Structure formats: C-alpha cells, structure tokens
C-alpha cells in the first residue's frame, strides 16, 4: 500500500488576488513572482472562490482546524477560548494513526475549565491547539524564534519586535523601501523552513502529517534584503477605495469605527498615525513590500518541495496551500482583516493530490470555504468525518469536478465585540452579544446581516467593489428579504448537530448518516 503524507501549508494574511496562476488565467498583469506556488497550481487544483469563514487569526484557524462555522465553535475573537469538546484536526488525525506535527501557530486560547486561571496561556493572544505535536512553535510570544535568532549570533534589541524596524532607523512613519534589520538568513520564514526540513529529515521517509505555518505576509510590512527591493511600487495594483475616508465611513457604523480607529503601528513597526490616511504612493510601497514577503515565503517553500523531490516523497504527498485570512491593503481605506469586505475574507486554496492529478492545472470556480479543509484531509486518509463538521470534502473536485449538489453561496461571519486592543462594541454602544454579522454571497449579490445594526446589500454585477449599499432601496426590498431568509435557513441547517444523528430505541443505540 502506498504511504500517505500530508503537508498542510498555512500562511498568514495572504489574500486571494495575489495568486499569479489565477492572474495569468484572467489576463491580468502578473506583478508577482511565485514559481513554487505556480508549480503547485500546475500540478493541482486552484480554488478561485475560496473564503475563510471568519476573521481574524484565532477564529479563522479554529474554523480551519475544526471544520466548524464560527457560530458553532464560538471562539469568536482573538483572546476568546475554544471549547475543549470540539474535535480538531490534530485529535482526529491521532484517530487514524498519525502524530500530527505542527510548525507555526494556531492562536488558540485554552478552555478555562480545563486549567487554572493562572495558566500563562491566558496572558498571551493565543497558544497552540491541543492534539498537535509542536516541532517549531511560534507561540507564545515568538520565544522559539527569537531564541533561534540569538543562538545564531544575532544581537536582539531590548524590545525584540524591533528587529522588524528598517535597517538604520529607530522609527518609521509608515511604508518603507528600506530592508528589515534582520537578514533573510534569520527571518521568521527561514526559521519555519529550517524547522520543517529538520522534522522531515528526522522522519526518514516514514509517513507524516505536517502543519507548516508561515507568519508572512502578515505585518510588520518590512522585508529582509533582497526582498525589500524586489518589486517596484509603480507596478503594484492601486488600492480600490472611495475618494476619501469619510465617504467610506458613511457606508455603515462599523465601517466608520474601523476607518477612524486603524493605526499605522499595527502594520509598520514603531509607526504612529492613522492607517486610513496613507496616500496612494505609500500604499503602493506597502504592497511592493507585501509582495516581497510573499516571494520570500515562496522561496522557502521551494526548499521544502526540493527535499520532497530529492527523497521521492513528492508523489506520495497531499499538499494543501491556504491562508488563515486576507488583508485589506488599503482597499476601502482599511488595513488588516476586519468587517465584511472581500479582501479580508477571500484567500488562496491550492490542493495537489499525491500521484497523478486528473485535473492538474485546473482553476475551480465552485464556492469553497475554509471549513472544507479538515474533512478533505480526513477523507483522503480514510478517516471518518465528524457528524458535527460543517465543512465538506473537496476530494471530488480533484478528480471529477464540482458535485451537482454543491453549495451555491459563500458564508462567513465576523464578531466585533471589544478585545484589549480594539473596542468597536464600546464605540457602537452595543451589548457584547449584539456584535456579530454574517454574510451570504453568491455570484450576483452580497447580503450582510447584523445582530443589532442595519443590514447591507450589494449588487456585485454592477458594484463589484461594494461601494453602494442597496439595503434601503425599495427596488431591492424583496431581494433583501430573500437573502435574509437564506441567512436564517443557513444558520438553522448548520445548528450544532454533534449528537443529533444518534437514536435510542428497542434495539439500543443506532446511528443515522442522513
């Protein structure tokens, strides 16, 4: 029997429209070079309509690794615990005989009922999800990475994140064309790659599952040489945004909060000022740096792919490439992953099956969601997909194409209650449990339903960039009602069903599949 390996690559904050394979297929300007991702696209299937079902990092990774919508796993924001009862991918893989290795992070806060309130994991943004075997952790506080840098003889600054200040500078106003202080040999992308190669060499050809995480192109937006100068700002696509931040802010109260509150310091180490006031030249420079960080990750992936080639494991390995969420990059005068706009939620997904790929090079337009990754991996390994899982296996797409009964809409959610570094709830004067939205989006329309704020409705055919809210337009009233009904039906259909397939009866306990 052929051995089965799984390499799950999870990058951070890489948005879907920065995938050259798709750009070329659409006849768009190829402004980014990713030869190793290109290879994966040529040998696998690229999913062009793929979304994370929630943002930011902690909730997104909870959905990716449990196969559950936000409304079911309820780790609704960074800093919010994940209930221990949920079966995650790591635990499920142990059930099929794998010791799932993890490089990177999952930004998971533990269930407080399972440990002491004094547990140090409650003093950080997140830690590692139970079930995985860490072989190159980035959390908590990036200590493993900083220790590796110091061990290699690099003098760390007193404030360790200042390694991401530009070379020769103690502060930066915003986007910069200067290289990072840290050379590429000691970058975090190199750190993760070295950990991956060490792990794979230690396996010595035995079957493996490896979650290979990368921190980039997540901010701070500064790249090591030569990646800092690899792309010209003038070659970058311009941000898609209204003429000024006030126009964007007028669309919705939640949009106003983010336009008014996003700070440059969250994206450029040591910077001050409003993120919404970056001009086009600064945003193009930021995008050039973002592309440099992407190409650095791609070069690192090339080292991992070469090792799999050299050891004869490439054709034995299912490789999945995806991101936790996207990045606004100045679109709508926003930075980060927030709210309801497409750039925050649309992410890459590429799957290369082991051996021959019947649809090699295909670009699939079916609607897929981050919750589909966990059941796909379990299905490929012959494991049982948990009944509670909201996602669906994508294996049919690799051989035959889109199933006839596949979903016809995309679904994603966002919870904007206060956390220690952002307070939209207080700004909006809402209760904690009123701070949620869900999105139903198909090829034509996008509906955003809020628990306690006005809805949004966009006609994507005529307004693909979501500038005009039609929710209050009488001509669209019937459609708005229809999509509100779709949202309600979706939530009813996907209510927690962990035990709903079991039945008791005269013959004892039975289990139904449908």
From Swiss-Prot:
Describe PTMs of this protein.
Answer: The conversion to 3-oxoalanine (also known as C-formylglycine, FGly), of a serine or cysteine residue in prokaryotes and of a cysteine residue in eukaryotes, is critical for catalytic activity.
Q: Does the keyword Hydrolase apply?
A: yes
Q: What CDD domains does the record point to?
A: PMH (cd16028)
The PTM 3-oxoalanine (Cys) maps to 57
Q: What is its EC number?
A: 3.1.4.-, 3.1.3.-
Q: Name one Pfam family in it.
A: Sulfatase
Cofactor: binding details: Mn(2+) is probably the active metal ion. Other metals such as Zn, Ca and Fe can also act as cofactors.
Q: How does activity depend on pH?
A: Optimum pH is 7.5.
Give any GO molecular function from the UniProt entry. Answer: sulfuric ester hydrolase activity
Q: What keyword terms does UniProt attach to this protein?
A: Calcium, Hydrolase, Manganese, Metal-binding, Plasmid
Cross-referenced Gene3D superfamilies: 6.10.250.3360, Alkaline Phosphatase, subunit A
| Similarity section | Belongs to the alkaline phosphatase superfamily.
Q: What does this protein do?
A: Hydrolytic enzyme with a broad substrate specificity acting on phosphate diesters and phosphonate monoesters.
SUBUNIT field: Homotetramer.
Protein's name in the database:
Multifunctional alkaline phosphatase superfamily protein pRL90232
